[in-house]
Regions:
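N-terminal accessory beta-strand-rich subdomains and adjacent acidic, glycine-rich linkers
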Residues: 20-263, 595-597
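Edge strands and adjacent loops of beta-rich recognition modules
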Residues: 90-95, 526-549
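An acidic-aromatic substrate-binding cleft motif
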Residues: 239-314
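Aromatic- and carboxylate-enriched substrate-binding clefts and catalytic-loop regions
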Residues: 318-490
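C-terminal beta-strand-rich structural cap/linker in extracellular carbohydrate-active enzymes
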Residues: 601-624
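Catalytic cores of secreted or luminal carbohydrate-active enzymes
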Residues: 492-538
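C-terminal motif of bacterial Sec signal peptides marking the signal peptidase cleavage site
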Residues: 16-17
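Carbohydrate-binding surface patches
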Residues: 542-580, 619-622
């Protein structure tokens, strides 16, 4: 296969396992992309092929760019260096560097399709550019993944993305749900984590969904070893130039994957001029313990009191608040929150998905005129954020609705949480009033069936390497008591989840009595728990086994460790990457001898090299 050569200063060496005539090399020399003349490409990481001979292609109403492609032109290589700030996420200050090049292909009819490639220091990305007065029919991108290759993929659930990420070594159909009516399938949602070579990983996802874009998914129905990109909408009309979202491949070690900001690097910059009103934080949350609790003013007041007592800035009043009684209505609840110095948030049904028999309020946000009236009412009553639920799919019209909700909320200073929603694709940068997104099989599922009970520990040690890589995750961590189905993870494990899982808005799910019964030292940590991080480091771990993540807030490092095994384990790690000062002290909240309880100790940071965890256990260490 003939390849086009370009000389780049940083690539004046041969990457073992890749063509010497590599087309595009990242500024640090780690990522190499080689594009062939017939519309295929290969990605290498640290000299190792991680994606070999992937296919490019699109079909439109007027043109077929899936076969017979020939490279007509390879443009000049340019350099990208960017810095930007976030309000939340893995780190506040982000920077990225990439080499960029655009390739023009012609099909057998002579029509042109452009593909813009970027080789970043932590991955590769590409997008299609089509032109004319035409209609997109399908994307023909194919990612080959050979049998025997480890992969962690979540079966596609377009109305929620609430599935597990089980380890698999082949492309056979998977069943990602306990419900009998959910059949095994060969369609998968983003992100997908793959280990093509031992110790070398890639995470496949997408970024920069704009108006008129559907989301996409992966499908290997036709070929178990080739995953095709399917669009969430059947056809898309366009005039002039049309750019696809960025097909995104984060690559490297597990630390490279977890610490990457490539999804937001590729997204549009923030559209908000003033973000001073956006304040991430912790919220009390009534729904987990009382599914219909928002109908009861007295219960709602208990959760507002909890937020005030724990010094959490927010309290979320969930579904059915429009039916509130027992001494008053929602306006009484909002007034009570203001009296207590707690910022209230309210839940809404998006009303384009689950409608019949679904919780209320409904149809208050669909039409723009109604939406603006509702937003004004919220502002007038001191509501600072809303949670919007039950989105149906990844169609372009649904994606546009998300953007409508986000954009219209800005003048009213409303932050948004999306629940029952699509996975993050970079909007947290473009619209920083987006606090968090569910799109995860989270603690709420203890309400629905016992499926999570025996799988939570493995799941919790997988999603830091998969779902949470691409954006904030509203798992609602920290269930010390039981809901309708039990949990068998330890108290140390549950405490660690609050740091292991990144979310600008962290909803605390348990009952007020559960927090009251925690040791004083643990309660104190929860009162000052950050949700904004200056930096993030993966210290150790492997999907489904264990994970140790460090996050920095100011001068303090918070280290969360999770044991995903059904047996005790010593989690070993090094603090060398944290740059600690001599004499730094650690407050360690580790497992007790049983599921419930803690072993609390203080020690020198220099002595913190491993922590013993019981089965399905965990720990939180705070270095100040």
């Amino acid at each position: 296969m003939k390849r086009i050569f370009v000389a780049i200063a940083s690539a004046a060496f041969v990457l073992a396992g890749c063509s010497a005539n590599t087309d595009l090399v990242s500024p640090n020399g780690k990522i190499a992309v080689s594009v062939s003349e017939d519309g295929h490409f290969t990605v290498c990481e640290s000299g190792v092929v991680i994606l070999d001979n992937a296919s490019l292609g699109y079909k439109t109403a007027a043109n077929d760019f899936s076969t017979g492609l020939k490279l007509a032109k390879a443009g000049k290589t340019s350099r990208i260096d960017e810095e930007y700030d976030m309000l939340a996420g893995k780190r506040l200050h982000c920077s990225n560097s990439a080499a960029e090049r655009t390739y023009t292909f012609k099909n057998e009819a002579g029509a042109s399709m452009q593909v813009e490639f970027r080789a970043y220091n932590d991955g590769a990305a590409f997008r299609y550019i089509l032109s004319g007065d035409d209609m997109v029919m399908s994307e023909e991108t194919l990612y080959p993944i050979a049998d025997g290759t480890k992969r962690w993929m979540s079966t596609y659930s377009p109305d929620s993305y609430e599935r597990m990420y089980p380890l698999a070594t082949d492309g056979k159909a998977q069943k990602g749900s306990p419900y009998p009516w959910v059949k095994a399938q060969t369609q998968y949602g983003y992100p997908a984590l793959v280990e093509p070579v031992d110790g070398h990983f890639m995470l496949i996802t997408e970024s920069d969904i704009r108006r008129g874009h559907p989301g996409s998914l992966l499908d290997n129905t036709d070929n178990e070893t080739a995953y095709k990109v399917l669009l969430g909408s059947d056809s898309l009309a366009f005039k002039g130039n049309w750019e696809s979202p960025w097909r995104t491949i984060i690559a490297g070690s597990l630390a490279d994957i977890v610490e990457s900001t490539l999804v937001t690097d590729l997204a549009e910059p923030s559209k908000l001029d003033d973000t001073s009103w956006i304040k991430p934080g912790v919220a009390s949350w009534i729904y987990w313990a009382y599914n219909h609790g928002s109908q009861d003013l007295q219960l709602v007041k208990e959760y507002i009191d909890l937020a005030a007592e724990m010094k959490w800035p927010y309290s979320l009043i969930d579904a059915e608040w429009d039916l509130m009684g027992n001494g008053g209505d929602v306006y009484d609840a909002l007034a009570y929150a203001r009296e207590k110095g707690v910022k209230p948030m309210l839940w809404y049904n998006c009303s384009i998905g689950w409608i019949n028999g679904a919780p209320t309020p409904k149809f208050r946000l669909n039409e723009r005129e109604d939406r603006l009236k509702e937003y004004q009412m919220l502002k007038d009553n001191g509501v600072t954020g809303i949670k919007i639920d039950f989105f149906p799919d990844d169609k372009a019209s649904t994606m546009d609705y998300y953007l409508d909700l986000l954009e219209d909320a800005v003048p009213y200073h409303l932050t948004l949480t999306f629940h029952g929603a699509t996975v993050p694709r970079g909007w947290q940068r473009t619209y920083p009033n987006l606090m968090t997104v569910e799109a995860v099989y989270g603690a709420e599922w203890y309400n629905n069936n016992a499926f999570l009970t025996t799988r939570a520990a493995v799941h919790n040690t997988t999603i830091p390497f998969t779902r949470n890589v691409v954006g904030p995750m509203d798992y609602t961590p920290g269930t010390f008591t039981d809901s309708q189905n039990p949990h068998i993870t330890s108290d140390g494990h549950e405490l660690a989840l609050m740091v292991a899982f990144e979310s600008a808005m962290q909803h605390m799910p348990d009952r007020p009595s559960a927090y009251a019964e925690l040791p004083d030292a643990v309660r104190t940590e929860l009162m000052i728990l950050p949700t904004v991080w200056d930096d993030t480091k993966l210290l150790a771990g492997y999907p489904g086994q264990d994970v140790v993540i460090a996050r920095r807030s100011g001068d303090a490092w918070y280290i969360a460790g999770l044991n995903g095994r059904d047996e005790a384990a010593d989690l070993s790690f090094s603090l060398d990457r944290l740059g600690l000062k001599d004499g730094a002290k650690v407050s360690l909240y580790a497992d007790g001898t049983e599921q419930h309880g803690f072993t609390i100790s203080s020690l020198d940071a220099a002595a913190l090299k491993s922590v013993h965890c019981i089965e399905r256990g965990g720990f939180l260490a705070v270095i100040r």
